């Protein structure tokens, strides 16, 4: 009996050590993702397209919450270093300083994520996907969220934004990204705040669009390799930004070659059809069908979005 067990031992060890191909670390991340997608059912894929991604236990996929913030330090996850607001950092006119700030932020975020994961906790503000920087142009001082921006100048905003992304994501020579940064809010989103869910940008000249509002986003995509872009609440030329073929497909994907994640702002898809939004679609089903053509991730912020 002992001799038989010894004969079978190599085979048993081989079976025990075998793992799905998509978990082979020697493969590129893109190849591993491609192999993993083939294993997922349609229902599982849909569940992974929301900010609160559900686990797929049979494939070893743990839950993940995409929502995390690092506007000027790791936010809402216990103690962390608090740096000046972006508008203050912009006043330094020092891109290198901004890089050093967000390199430190990414160190803290990584450490916190490692700790939370070791405790089996995957809640909001504990992940590695930071929804920053805000590279909208601060044109009107009445806009309450202007402090989140790097000011009114597209060039300065571009330089600062590029350094934020590089500080958060790390160098491109690594096998994995340190974190994900997210360029937001795409596009032409600079107030007013009170009607951001229904405001439509119209009569904007092509020159103003390309010289004022788009340069920071283009720089973050082409120079910094930002991994995520968040579409805005407002409409652009009659289409909700999160359903705008011109913004998300023609400009972002085709013209700039962005191949990362496009996600909606918090609850933006509900604005496609609800009474206080754009009323561009009649119901949740048609709104979702339109959104999914352009989006990789849909943010669900409350009960009204789950209709």
Residue ranges of predicted features:
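Glycoside hydrolase catalytic-domain context in secreted enzymes
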Residues: 17-306
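Positively charged n-region of N-terminal signal peptides that target proteins for export
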Residues: 1-4
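Bacterial N-terminal signal peptides
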Residues: 8-15
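Short amphipathic alpha-helical "recognition" segments used for binding
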Residues: 6-8, 188
């Amino acid at each position: 009996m002992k001799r038989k067990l010894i004969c079978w031992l190599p085979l048993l060890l081989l079976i025990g050590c075998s793992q799905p191909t998509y978990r082979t670390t020697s493969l590129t991340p893109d190849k591993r993702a491609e192999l993993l997608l083939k294993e997922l059912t349609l229902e599982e894929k849909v569940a992974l397209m929301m900010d609160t991604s559900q686990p797929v236990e049979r494939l070893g996929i743990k839950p993940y919450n995409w929502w995390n913030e690092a506007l000027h330090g790791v936010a809402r996850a216990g103690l962390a270093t608090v740096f000046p607001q972006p508008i203050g950092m912009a006043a330094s006119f020092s891109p290198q300083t901004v890089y050093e700030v967000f390199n430190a932020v990414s160190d803290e975020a990584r450490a916190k994520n490692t700790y939370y994961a070791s405790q089996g906790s995957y809640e909001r503000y504990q992940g590695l996907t930071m929804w920053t920087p805000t590279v909208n142009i601060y044109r009107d001082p009445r806009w309450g969220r202007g402090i989140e921006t790097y000011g009114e100048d597209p060039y300065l905003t571009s330089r600062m934004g590029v350094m934020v992304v590089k500080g958060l994501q790390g160098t491109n020579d690594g096998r994995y990204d340190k974190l994900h940064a997210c360029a937001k809010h795409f596009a032409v989103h600079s107030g007013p705040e009170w009607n951001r869910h229904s405001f439509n940008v119209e009569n904007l000249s092509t020159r103003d669009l390309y010289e004022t509002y788009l340069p920071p986003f283009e720089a973050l995509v082409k120079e910094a390799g930002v991994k995520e872009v968040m579409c805005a609440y407002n409409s652009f030329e009659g289409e909700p930004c999160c359903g705008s073929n011109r913004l998300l497909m023609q400009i972002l994907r085709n013209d700039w070659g962005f191949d990362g994640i496009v996600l909606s702002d918090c609850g933006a898809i509900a604005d496609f059809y609800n009474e206080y939004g754009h009323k561009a679609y009649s119901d949740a089903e048609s709104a979702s069908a339109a959104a999914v053509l352009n989006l990789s991730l849909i943010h669900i912020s409350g009960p009204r979005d789950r209709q």
